[in-house]
Structures are given as C-alpha cells and as structure tokens.
C-alpha cells in the first residue's frame, strides 16, 4: 500500500513504525494503520478474509470485520480516550451476529479484557445483557475461576501498558514492574 501511494506521488512518513504510516500529497493525507498502538491487534489476512462489503462515497469497499474492530478497540483505555462506549454500542448492535468463537480466539491470553467489556455491557444495558450469549460469559468466567485456583506468579508484571501508553509508566519506571 505504501509503495503504491509513493508511486502515486505521496510522501510517506512513519511516525509510529510499529503500527502507523502517513501518506501526504497536497493538502490531503491518508493514515495507513497496520497494527494497534500496543502491537497486539496486528492487521493480518483474517481482517481481509472476514471483511464486510460496504459502500463509502458511492464506492464499493471492504470494511473492517466487527470482531476485529471490537478486538482492536477493546485495548484503548487512555486517560484522554477510552473506547468502552464504542465497544458497548457495537455489542448492542451486533452481538447476535458476531463470530464469538473467533472473537475469543482473537483475544487469546488477553481474554480478561474481553470479559471486562462483557461485564460492563451488562452494567450499561442490564435489560439487554443476554445479547451476549450465555456460553460466552460461562467460558470467560470459567477461565477466571480456573485462574483464581492457580497460584499467582512471583514475577512482577504490569500489563497496564497494553491498555494505556502513559498511565502505567510509573509502574514500569518507578515501581519495579
């Protein structure tokens, strides 16, 4: 993509090489996003395999699959930007059509983040919490129950920097995590 944009006369900048490039020409720019800022939700072939057909400005396009949108937005918990409301709205609108097995698989070892959003969804929309299938909640809560039966590691780990690039820096820089 960047090569094609460069060949079309765009200048390319990579302000965050691990996830974002920008292409500029005249007064216009295009963000080329190929991962999440934390490096977890990398754009891979599955984004394209499951893309949703749509139309933008009367042009046919392939849109990000809802599962990948949920996955990538779920980790955005900055002081100045929290995508939790977006997650709740996406779940309210699309929970019945989601490929929940694929979504759970996408979260992998970060399943607690998905569980936290599912729990918050039940708080935000208590009368609609059954939009999230019971087996999904049972699976995630089952993982939590199993985790609680496993002794904690002695290793000092702070995964907060996966959720916020700034808010957990004291943990890493000052408190020994």
Regions found by a protein language model. Name each.
Residues 1-177:
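Compositionally biased terminal segments of proteins
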């Amino acid at each position: 993509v960047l090569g094609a944009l460069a060949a079309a006369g765009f200048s390319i900048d990579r302000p965050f090489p691990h996830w974002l490039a920008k292409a500029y020409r005249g007064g216009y720019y295009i963000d080329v996003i190929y991962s999440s800022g934390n490096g977890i939700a990398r754009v891979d072939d599955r984004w394209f395999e499951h893309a949703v057909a749509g139309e933008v400005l009367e042009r046919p396009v392939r849109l990000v699959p809802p599962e990948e949108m949920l996955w990538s937005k779920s980790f955005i918990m900055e002081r100045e930007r929290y995508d939790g409301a977006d997650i709740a709205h996406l779940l309210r609108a699309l929970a019945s059509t989601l490929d929940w097995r694929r979504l759970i698989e996408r979260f992998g070892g970060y399943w607690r983040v998905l569980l936290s959003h599912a729990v918050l969804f039940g708080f935000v929309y208590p009368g609609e919490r059954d939009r999230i299938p019971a087996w999904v909640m049972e699976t995630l809560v089952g993982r939590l129950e199993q985790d609680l039966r496993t002794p904690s590691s002695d290793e000092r780990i702070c995964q907060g920097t996966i959720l916020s690039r700034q808010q957990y820096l004291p943990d890493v820089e000052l408190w020994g995590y």
